[in-house]
Amino acid sequence: MAKKILLCDPTLRDGNHAVRHQLTRESFAAYCQAAEAANVPVVEVGHGNGLGASSMLVGECLLSDEDIFTISREHLHKSRMAIHLIPGFCTIKKDLTRALELGVDLFRVASHCTEADITDRHIHFVRNSGKEAWGILMMSHMTSPAVLLEEARKMESYGAEAIVIMDSAGAYFPDDVKERISTLVNGLTVPVGFHGHNNLGMSVINSVVAVQEGATIIDGTIRGFGAGAGNTQLEVLVAVFERLGYETGIDLYKILDAADIAEKGFNPVAPSISPLSIVSGLAGVFSGFAKPVAKAAKDYNVDPRDIFFGLGERKAVAGQESLIYEVARDLAKRNENSVEKGQ
């Protein structure tokens, strides 16, 4: 019997990073219809940084969370509607309660890879409300497999029904994935998943290795639409898993049709492994920093690659966008001092 893989599609959430959180009503409606037709089991929607995150700090969303959920819910019937949420951005009283009222099916409660403690109240609230909650560990390359397991066990103890690790910076090689996924699969009683980014061109093979090591949940976005160099490309995953004998339940032809719809409707620059994306992966810095890093480099007349490596040294994580300009200012000052000394 073929092994079943649950493919989750965060195109309408992670993909929002690629257009500065400006996906339109028409884009949400059209893509939800296409994903539903292709039998995509889970469709994640929202601001790129999740529920309640729209702000000047990380980017203001064109649509409100409420509008996004209402539009998406209207077109998702077989497919489950999921959201990403980070405690701190997302409050229980204001945001989570309303998301429940608007029909969200699956809540992916996320934290930095060493800060699972902050998810306790949110996971408990979702579970006590009768809905499904998963634990998401972001920037998972920044700690060891042993610590990841400790943090994942915390989420499991809070009631998380699955644990997904995110390679948020696209920094992993297959051996990194193998070590971490096998550790989690052997140490947890809930399903384990993997969310890849393609900064170093490894996202598809990393996803395959994750499945070979026991992961049963894999994330992918249509056309790789997402932060930085993009996510693991969903339609490629469907084709590759079909070739390898895994069962996803997704209609290959219809997901390829969805890719065409997205390409024409979203009007993004097609995800590619740009020089900055490579540096982001090497530095281990969140892929979504690419655009603000480029702007800061221009504003301060410094090399954006140096900004990325500076952010890596400071172990910057998503939500710390203010560090980008701090690093840029420090580099500009250092360059100015070097010029003065050389005179």
From Swiss-Prot:
It catalyses: (S)-4-hydroxy-2-oxopentanoate = acetaldehyde + pyruvate. The record marks R13 as: Transition state stabilizer. Residues 5-256 form the Pyruvate carboxyltransferase domain. GO terms for biological process: 3-phenylpropionate catabolic process; L-leucine biosynthetic process. Keywords: Aromatic hydrocarbons catabolism, Lyase, Manganese, Metal-binding. The keyword GTP-binding does not apply. The active site is at H17. Substrate binds at R13, D14, S168, H195. Pathway: Aromatic compound metabolism; 3-phenylpropanoate degradation. It comes from the Bacteria. Mn(2+) binds at D14, H195, H197. Its EC number is 4.1.3.39. The keyword Manganese applies. CDD domains: DRE_TIM_HOA. GO terms for molecular function: 2-isopropylmalate synthase activity; 4-hydroxy-2-oxovalerate aldolase activity; manganese ion binding. Catalyzes the retro-aldol cleavage of 4-hydroxy-2-oxopentanoate to pyruvate and acetaldehyde. Is involved in the meta-cleavage pathway for the degradation of aromatic compounds. Interacts with MhpF. HAMAP family: HOA. Belongs to the 4-hydroxy-2-oxovalerate aldolase family. This is 4-hydroxy-2-oxovalerate aldolase.
